[in-house]
């Protein structure tokens, strides 16, 4: 058991039905700047690699959330890591999925800058018509970090706690991949981020945390203003990988965040082939600081 981990059992949420709809696929693809024709096809579009992060749109109420009965303050909730593992082909429009979410563990750790961070490992599993028995088609694992409010007397609206997610990933013993020199497979710079981009992604994914679009709410957390949804750049990176990998299925896609991305940042996406079936993607801000790193393993 990890130091500070609470010996607590969590009850899985009730399963719910998710019908993959072609209009939602295209909306998600547009919100994440997908260059892939299969995501925008007029018939049976294929879901983008991170599309299933939108599952919360199909939840009826709190009983379908792994968080049911657990308080969380969205002003101080950070996304440390995300991982998708695929055990079959990506769903196409019309696919009916059974989805069930659960918290596997929750524990505390002292941050390097002081204060207590609470880590939550949230797992969402997706099955096809077989229901929620047997191996899932897709498994999504999220590491969420709840941090403490800024110290009393700290000036509001000025902080940028850029390194907290990195501390979080180290704390849960995620091994950072060190890639050997390899082939650069894409190197692009996207247009400067806007709050409109954040809102489009929030609508497409169902992540409605107001910290990404509401200035007053963001400043109440100690931030200077709204900032990018972490999964936005993760989805853009995944789409660029799909455009390069073509028809080769991805088995695992993992992301960890290092720095917040802000309105006005024109993010640079660099994808490197690190092995016969593996890739690393670095997403950097205009100042050269890393926003996120993603790793992908394909099946061939």
Describe the residue ranges of each PLM region.
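Catalytic-pocket segment enriched in acidic/His residues
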Residues: 225-228, 232-267, 272-274, 283-286
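HotDog/MaoC-like acyl-thioester-processing domains
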Residues: 1-3, 81, 85-190, 257-300
